[in-house]
Amino acid sequence: NSPQQLAQLERAFQLQQANALMVQGVRLADPGRLDVRGVLQCDADVEIDVNCIFEGKVHLGEGVRVGPNCVIANAHIAAGAVIHAFTHIDGEKLGVTVGEGALIGPFARLRPGAQLGAEVHIGNFVEVKNSTLAKGAKANHLAYLGDATVGERVNYGAGSITANYDGANKHRTVIESDVHVGSNCVLIAPVTIGAGGTVGGGSTISKSTEPGALSVARGKQVSIANWKRPQKTPKP
């Protein structure tokens, strides 16, 4: 067979799978723009937008919405979850679980071992790897959670990361329930942030904190009055 014939056969096979899903009640924005490269199981009232790819074993629970241009592999997406556009979910060997009513993306990345509870929010340009997030935890912008255990109702600020690798071994970060982590924080594992605590924006935390404590670890601000900026040297 020529590459052209193989491509035509693949398109016919994919359309066959799309039609079978629609017979089951799945709503596809365009059956001609769907790729199922494994086993896709859909419960009632599922919607899938265009240009989505499903690999390995994927289960979409009742009422799940998948936005355009998503890639989902080896994952269980529970009822009522919404996967916004351009989200990449790769369960590989460890799998990925997204809880009921969770909101993921757009432009989010869930890597192997990501286990998200009900009503978790993972926003744009957030990466989660080998981490557990309990009900209602939120990381909405530009963040990294690797090898972490995150409690209920945690708010994880924009630009914050868990520093989980010391150059030789991976270490775990524990963020207990009701913690607020400010923007641009670094949590150097192994470390535990106590329940109800607050981490001030811009802090680098290398020691565990007590429950309910405010933890701030950053350089003192210095403001120099009447500062004159360097001037460009004229080109010869």
Which residues fall in each region the model found?
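Phosphate-binding active sites in nucleotide-utilizing proteins
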Residues: 32, 37-82, 87
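Residue-level signal for inorganic ion chemistry
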Residues: 2, 48, 154
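Terminal amphipathic alpha-helical/low-complexity segments used for targeting or macromolecular assembly
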Residues: 1-33, 37-40, 45, 80, ...
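A short linear-motif detector with a strong N-terminal bias
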Residues: 5-7, 13-15, 26-27, 32-33, ...
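A signal for specific C-terminal beta-sheet/loop modules enriched in small/flexible residues
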Residues: 14-17, 51, 55-57, 69, ...
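Glycine-rich hexapeptide-repeat left-handed beta-helix
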Residues: 74, 80-236
